[in-house]
């Protein structure tokens, strides 16, 4: 999708305020919903994904399972709200050995598990709105000893509210971000920054 796009800085793949936030996303929902609502805390439109079973309620990008994103930027960032329910997301990448690997982070897992084609890890979230930062290059190297080449697919499961999902060439401070990438929290004033925990355990 983005193979022929010049990639630097910030590359947004979902923005809840946009005219068609799910234009490049496929929606799979059973016993749940994906809808745009106004979040009372930030008084702004957000995308809510809710479902009784997280495995049957998710959005994925790109829409066509045969196509890939082709995003080379190494930082994956999501601005999401903790709904105090099970929540997970998955990023599929390809490394310099031409092997596809999946990284799945969830708030209901306690240990990191690395298998040849999938790495699952726990993720802690604060109350309210969180900024989840995922250094794909670092995780690929630590889990598999290979180098990150590009991201192929993203899947975001219930249960959460999403403000924005984007890729970046590096981590940006709040002051460096363009205004439309910032989330203004009237109550706390500061967005909680999280990263999936990569703590290896021997099993």
Swiss-Prot record:
One GO term (biological process): cilium assembly
One GO cellular component term noted in the UniProt record for this chain: nucleus
Disulfide bonds: none
Localisation per UniProt entry: Nucleus; Cytoplasm, Cytoskeleton, Microtubule organizing center, Centrosome, Centriole; Cytoplasm, Cytoskeleton, Cilium basal body; Cytoplasm, Cytoskeleton, Cilium axoneme
Entry keyword annotation includes Cytoplasm: yes
Pfam families: CFA20_dom (PF05018)
Domain of life: Eukaryota
Key words of the record: Cell projection, Cilium, Cytoplasm, Cytoskeleton, Microtubule, Nucleus
UniProt keyword DNA-binding present: no
Function: Cilium- and flagellum-specific protein that plays a role in axonemal structure organization and motility. Microtubule inner protein (MIP) part of the dynein-decorated doublet microtubules (DMTs) in cilia axoneme, which is required for motile cilia beating. Involved in the regulation of the size and morphology of cilia. Required for axonemal microtubules polyglutamylation.
Family statement: Belongs to the CFAP20 family.
PANTHER family: ORF PROTEIN (PTHR12458)
Name this polypeptide is given: Cilia- and flagella-associated protein 20
Organism: Caenorhabditis briggsae
Lineage: Eukaryota, Metazoa, Ecdysozoa, Nematoda, Chromadorea
